[in-house]
């Protein structure tokens, strides 16, 4: 089992699919990485040599922001918005939807469980 960017990559899957187990690498980036390292799409992780795994690891470390670094970067960006006091920052601070979705109904995932209102009966 190959270990890339701190993630155990499944050996029985194709390389393009297995790379997507790393947070921050989707289908397009996985295809880019395979093209840079000259690995065919049909190749499985179990068929990779140690040199190819090392090459993939170096490419990801050099060119892409993944796993903990990516999560940290996103958290810093959100904190910056909250410190600025801009509209998006205020929405994050109040734990409401940020991208213009309606909140009168829906938005239960973001707002949490419905809070009962005292004295209101049907």
Swiss-Prot record:
Extract the SUPFAM superfamilies matched here: S13-like H2TH domain
Classify the source by domain of life.
Bacteria
InterPro entries tied to this protein: Rbsml_uS13_C (IPR027437), Ribosomal_uS13 (IPR001892), Ribosomal_uS13-like_H2TH (IPR010979), Ribosomal_uS13_bac-type (IPR019980)
Give positions of region: Disordered. 95-122
Gene3D superfamilies xref list? 1.10.8.50, 30s ribosomal protein s13, domain 2
Record's keyword terms, sorted: Ribonucleoprotein, Ribosomal protein, RNA-binding, rRNA-binding, tRNA-binding
In the UniProt record, which is one GO cellular component term? cytosol
Q: Which family does it belong to?
A: Belongs to the universal ribosomal protein uS13 family.
**BP terms from Gene Ontology:** translation
Q: Name one GO molecular function term.
A: rRNA binding
Q: What does this protein do?
A: Located at the top of the head of the 30S subunit, it contacts several helices of the 16S rRNA. In the 70S ribosome it contacts the 23S rRNA (bridge B1a) and protein L5 of the 50S subunit (bridge B1b), connecting the 2 subunits; these bridges are implicated in subunit movement. Contacts the tRNAs in the A and P-sites.
| Record's signal peptide | none
Subunit composition and interactions: Part of the 30S ribosomal subunit. Forms a loose heterodimer with protein S19. Forms two bridges to the 50S subunit in the 70S ribosome.
Entries under PANTHER family matching the protein: 30S RIBOSOMAL PROTEIN S13/40S RIBOSOMAL PROTEIN S18 (PTHR10871), SMALL RIBOSOMAL SUBUNIT PROTEIN US13M (PTHR10871:SF1)
Q: Write the protein's name.
A: Small ribosomal subunit protein uS13
């Amino acid at each position: 089992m190959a270990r890339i960017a701190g993630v155990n990559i499944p050996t029985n899957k194709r390389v393009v699919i297995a790379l997507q187990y790393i947070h921050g690498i989707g289908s397009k980036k996985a295809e880019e990485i395979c093209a840079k390292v000259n690995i065919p799409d049909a190749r499985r992780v179990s068929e990779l040599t140690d040199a190819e795994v090392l090459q993939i690891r170096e490419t990801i470390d050099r060119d892409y922001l993944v796993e903990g670094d990516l999560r940290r970067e996103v958290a810093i960006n959100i904190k910056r918005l909250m410190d600025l006091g801009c509209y998006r920052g205020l929405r994050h601070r109040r734990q409401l939807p940020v991208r213009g979705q309606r909140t009168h109904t829906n938005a239960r995932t973001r707002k949490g469980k419905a809070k009962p209102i005292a004295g209101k009966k049907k």
